[in-house]
C-alpha cells in the first residue's frame, strides 16, 4: 500500500466573509460554518478532518434580503439583465467564463478536497463546465439569429424570442456540484423560451 503525498494538492483555507446582495458583495458579520474535507493529512493515528475554510451561516433575514434583491433585479422581466441586449448578456457570460478559467487550479483542488474526486475527474468537471458555458454562448447566438425573423403558422405571424426566466434557487448535488449549478444557472438566466 503506497501513500501518496498530499503536499502538491494542499490549499490554504478560504474564509468567505461576504455574500451577494444588490449586485455587490456585502460583508458578513454573523456566524460562520466551517467546511471540512474528510481527508486527513496529519500523520498521527487520531482522525482529524482537514479544514477547507468557512462560509457565512446566513440567517433567514439575510436570505430574505438576498431573495428580495434578486427579485428586484429581475423586476418581473423589466430589470437590467432581462432587458439587456443579447450581445451584452453574452459578453457578460464570456467574461465570467474567462475569469473562471483564471481560477481553474484552486477550483479543481477544492473539488478534490471537498467531495473526494481524483484530480483527473475534477479537471474534467471543471473543463466540461467551462466548455458548456462557451457552447451555450455559441448556441444562444444561433438561436437569437434564427429568432430574429417572423414565423407563420396557420395564418398567424409570430416573433418568438427567448429570455431569462427570473429568480432561481440552485442547490448543487454532491457528485457534480460545479456542472449542475452551472447548467441550472445558465438555463434559467439565459436561454429558456
Explain the meaning of each model-derived region.
Residues 35-37, 60-63, 152, 178:
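A short local loop/turn or secondary-structure capping micro-motif enriched for an aromatic residue
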Residues 184-193:
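Conserved small/polar residues in nucleotide/adenosyl-binding loops
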Residues 41-144:
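Glycine-rich loop-to-alpha-helix module at the N-terminal edge of alpha/beta enzyme cores
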